[in-house]
Amino acid sequence: MSSGLFGWKVECAYDPDRQGLMDMPSDRPHPMLTRRAFSVSLLGAAAFPFVGRAFAQTPSDIRSRIAGMSQLHAILVQRGEESIVAEAPRGPGLDRVANIKSCSKSIIGLLTGNAIAEGAIPSIDATIGDIAPSIIPANATPGVEDLTIEDLLTLRAGLESTSGRNYGAWVNSDNWVSFALRRPMVASPGGRMIYSTGTTHILGAVLAVATGKNLLEQARAVLGQPLGIEIPAWTRDPQGYYFGGNQMAMTPRGMLRIATLMRDQGRFDGDQIIPADWIDQSTQAHTRSPYSGLAYGYGWFLSRSGFVIARGYGGQIIAAHPEKDLAVAITSDPTSPARSG
């Protein structure tokens, strides 16, 4: 498969968002789906004529290629301030919200940086026991009180995943946070990456307690209002905590603004929205996916070709390449694994 302009592909496996049966990493190739992997490189090749001069294709040629990708709903590519591609061959369009699936984890990462910058959380090394002891159940796994913000943000809590075969039991439990904090330790905290939406949900609850604002309020205040992004309410757990790490929704244009924020060191329209040093920390490799081998920062995958990527089931993508001055947003059919073009 050609690497194209973007030089990376996304292989999406089953995710919890639809049937609620499983929740697998958005970068994990499912053994039955590998040949149907969604190739972002094709989209890169489609956009390349506007970015470089490698191919002599007309805009109609590019639109034809995009239209031929049956699962693709929308794609926006921006270089600098120039719109390279803005197409929505199907789906709700560019200006109506779409479920961004596990791209939500990357949004939680940005909210974490803001909470630290504002002093609601003292540092990345602060622990659950220090910040939000009230969320820890009496029968929690010993040691969870010492889990740090960084452990949660990098999916290195060491707790057994709530994803995969455990997902159904988790979301059908009467307390999602307690369920996740009662999982046995299967690795040392701060050790290997264990993809688990439950870990990000714990972080979301910690953010809510630490800031005194729920995730919806934080998302709207930190990102929605400054960037002009519509962020509707999404799923809440039985205790009222917004789902941390899944089910958020944005328009494709809103997703593109998040991408430009990452590309431009946390700046948007001349304002510093997220501290630049947090963007730097977020785009450093803190661990590595055991499935794709990609490095993982503070909620963002890091491609070998230089892209910073938020990924969600079915082909939901927010990506930035600072060196190439590129910002990308892609939405796809959220009910099916992504396919190649």
Question: Where on the chain are the PLM-derived regions?
Answer:
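N-terminal secretory signal peptides
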Residues: 1-33, 37, 41-48
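Boundary at the C-terminal end of the N-terminal hydrophobic targeting segment
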Residues: 54-56
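Active-site Gly/Thr loop motif
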Residues: 230-231, 276-328, 337
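A short, well-structured edge-of-sheet supersecondary motif
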Residues: 63-93, 318-319, 325-329
